[in-house]
Amino acid sequence: MECVNFEKNKQKIALLTDSCADLSAQQREGKPIFVLPLCIRCGQEEYADGETIFARDVYRHLEEGELPKTSLPDGGRLKDILDDIAAQGYEKVLAIHLSAGLSGTYNMVRIQGESRDDLEVAVFDSVSGSLGMGAVVLQAWEDIQGGMSWEELTQKRVPQLIANTFPYFSVDTLEYLLKGGRIGKVTALTGTMLNIKPIVGFAPDGQLASVAKVRGRKAVQGKLVDQLRAKLGSHTRYNLAVANGGAPEEMEQLAQKVKEAFPNYEHFWTGELDATLSVYIGSGMLGACIQFLDE
């Protein structure tokens, strides 16, 4: 077991999230971020998201006509992670999880967290996913390092971050959202032949919802920038993030456009879509997110 240095974390707070936060090993390095993998079943085999199955594997299954099945994380694995957190000397756990409108992960962690006598566990529904959720986790670590108290983190800051983080992403096809039962409030478009691409965000109840649509893939990046600009208003302090699902070169183009449009960001993060969300979104996703830090 590694020796934990609590110099920058005197309250001994660990961060727990799940594989749908899309945080890379590099983004987690040196931080007390623990990741609970969701489960994915392909045929008779079950895999752990981000460990034994990745988005590229899901795309292959989808191309072959097989729709993988997603499921909750393993309860025993969650217990093991919490045991490990306690064994390393942490006393508190700030848990931020995939939207309860898409998954039961939040409730699962909440119930198990309540049963712990050795850890104080505060569990939050991110009402988001991908780097929308990841941005909340990463900014929470910045606040922990800055000395923010546990009470302020749990009672004010994290709820504020969740309410002020806005991810948007393009969906190349609605086929998998429909098949996987996660279509939510996304408008089912019949104009496939018209090359209509929906831009999707999260509704207040955590389900996916249509926010815009464009004609043709080339218009996606500009529309994502427009969505962020429409949200910006009078805010002056913000973080930015972009993500992709099987479209890394286009994400780099999008990153440049987002940075040019909003040059005064405090942090800029990038990510690759996880295997779980890839089951419903398929390949070709582009996403952009803005997170406001002022009230």
Predicted feature descriptions by range:
Residues 53-59, 88, 110-115:
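A short glycine/small-residue-enriched secondary-structure motif
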Residues 73, 125-127:
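Short beta->alpha junction loops
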Residues 65-108, 155, 162:
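Glycine-rich phosphate- or other oxyanion-binding loops that anchor nucleotides, phosphorylated ligands
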Residues 3-9, 14, 20-34, 38-39, ...:
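Mixed-charge interfacial surface used for oligomerization/domain docking
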Residues 13-73, 77:
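N-terminal glycine-rich anion-binding loop in soluble enzyme alpha/beta folds
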